[in-house]
Design a protein with these regions (language model features):
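N-terminal Sec signal peptide cleavage junction
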Residues: 2-5
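Solvent-exposed beta-strand motifs enriched in subsets of small alpha/beta binding domains
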Residues: 10-106
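Extracytoplasmic/secreted envelope proteins and their assembly/folding machinery
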Residues: 33-40, 74-77, 111-119, 140-144
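Surface-exposed patches in mature extracellular/periplasmic domains of secreted proteins
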Residues: 48-53, 87-92, 126-134, 154-160
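Surface-exposed beta-loop interaction hotspot
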Residues: 98-126
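A glycine-rich, coil/turn loop motif that links secondary-structure elements
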Residues: 129-137, 163-170
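Active-site nucleophilic cysteine motif
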Residues: 134-149
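...with weaker cross-activation on analogous glycine-rich loops/strands in unrelated enzymes
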Residues: 152-173
Length: 173
């Protein structure tokens, strides 16, 4: 027998703060999207969880990792460079992200950037379990990527995203 759907319980509106991204390796900035896609795929075959995106300067940039210190990120990048997996790299610091800048400019600044980043992925196909712009995203993979590109470390799966978020009453939307 099938049970009737249960209503989603309302969680108390306790304020939550998402974890911030740490230091990230950027291993490419390309004029051609195909080059970024190839590097991303190569990095992902190494289990690095890379993604690419189109930056405001028009270049397609490839990023991966989430390190506690710049030294850890640099050491990992140098190892990958020595192994011939990446060539040039740049370490993205937490203060470079919109989430940190939003402390100065306010939450509307962050919201606007999240929407702009998500719009940059319009046209990328839906793929169940997908987490990349080259093959496709599922809903939680897209949201995770958009948040990470803005400096907020959101879990991969929708259940974790739900738990990381803050309940908002329908009337407050």
């Amino acid at each position: 027998s099938c049970a009737a759907p249960q209503p989603v319980s309302e969680r108390p509106g306790s304020a939550k703060t998402l974890a911030m991204m740490g230091f990230v390796i950027q291993a490419g900035a390309f004029a051609q999207v195909d080059n970024a896609a190839r590097l991303t795929e190569r990095l992902n075959t190494q289990g690095l969880g890379a993604t690419y995106f189109k930056a405001s300067d028009g270049l397609f940039k490839v990023r991966f990792g989430n390190f506690l210190s710049k030294d850890q990120a640099r050491a990992r990048a140098l190892t990958l460079q020595k192994d011939g997996i990446i060539q040039d790299f740049y370490i993205v610091a937490p203060e470079d992200y919109v989430a940190i800048q939003g402390r100065r400019y306010g939450t509307d600044y962050i919201r606007t950037s999240l929407v702009k980043t998500a719009r940059d992925f319009i046209g990328v196909p839906y793929l169940w379990g997908g987490t990349s712009a080259e093959k496709g995203f599922d809903c939680s993979g897209l949201i995770m990527t958009v948040y990470q590109l803005n400096g907020l470390d959101l879990p991969r799966h929708s259940a974790g995203q739900y738990e990381a978020g803050q309940f908002v009453n329908r009337n407050d939307l």
